[in-house]
Amino acid sequence: MLDVGDGHRVYWRRHGNADAPTVVLLHGGPGGGIFPRCAEFFDPAHWNVVMYDQRGCGRSTPTASTVANTTTCLVADLELLRLELGIDRMALYGVSWGTRLAVAYGIAHPEHCTGFLLSSIFLGRGVDIDWFLWGVRRLFPENHDRLLDAIAATTGERPTNRAQLLALAGEVFSSGEPDRKQQLANQWDDYEWRMMSVAPMPPLPTDPLELAKTRAKSLTLAILEHHFMASVLPAEGDLLEQVGRIGHLPCEIVHGRYDVICPAEQARLLAEAWPEAFLHIEPMDGHRIFAPAMAERIHEASRRLRRRIDADASRLGSAP
């Protein structure tokens, strides 16, 4: 555990070759926590793979805390982790929300980055939040209705727009009523889960202990996603305007054509703003990175990124 200040402690772990170039994995959400399977995208003989739970989620403590939990705080945590690891430069692999965090860190600390692998891009602009919370109703009306019904059931009022949705959900998540919070969090998580992939998603576990673990994660995810969408991201600038600070670094982007959570336009806009970005749109997949074709493209991108990092190091006469 790494003490990052503000009462937060961050859980981290390492895999692979400690003497190889480092890649740090940035999970989605915010609040999603690490998926150990993500380490499989990187050859353990050729990468020092580091993953960690961002503030308030996974094994990091305190759980689901929104206190001192902003993008700026998370960027500072990643810099503290780099210092803890004793490394000068590192690659970043971001998934969904983790792509925005990776770009934000790179903009703040370009001198400590070797390259980026980004999948299922989330830019975090107002238009992106609007789409996820309201616009997607055009494709998944019944799924969106279930979320609105859950808000109505827990607040007595059914939202009619994105601002109302966030305001009413905020009343529930900031309340001291655990049952209400869990009820809405379950539906919030289900809402996202049902749109994750082109193919049907696996059902929820039936074992009571496993289901309890899943629902605990649902609560953390819902609270932190809501916190960032309602309070943090609207106050931040458009990162696309600052990508030039890292535009000289290699970047591999993998995105599903039918990603309805984060439409492919976000990946295209990022690639257009990044001179050294290579964009691959997987033609038959959505947001889920573990879909077979998406996973294979990410594997390929990790190998390509390593070659590009090595080539840059050779050209500059430095270690990768």
Question: Where are each of the predicted segments found?
Answer:
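Conserved alpha/beta-hydrolase "acid-adjacent" motif
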Residues: 260-266
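Conserved hydrolase catalytic core segment
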Residues: 88-130
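Active-site nucleophile elbow and catalytic-triad environment of alpha/beta-hydrolase enzymes
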Residues: 226-243
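Short beta-strand/loop motif that positions the catalytic acidic residue
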Residues: 246-247, 253-255
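Catalytic active-site module of serine/aspartate enzymes centered on a nucleophile-bearing elbow/loop
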Residues: 277-320
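A catalytic-pocket lid/entrance helix-loop region that shapes and gates access to the active site
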Residues: 113-166
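Conserved acidic catalytic loop of the alpha/beta-hydrolase fold
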Residues: 72-90
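Conserved HGGG/HGGXW glycine-rich cap/lid loop of the alpha/beta-hydrolase fold
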Residues: 5-62
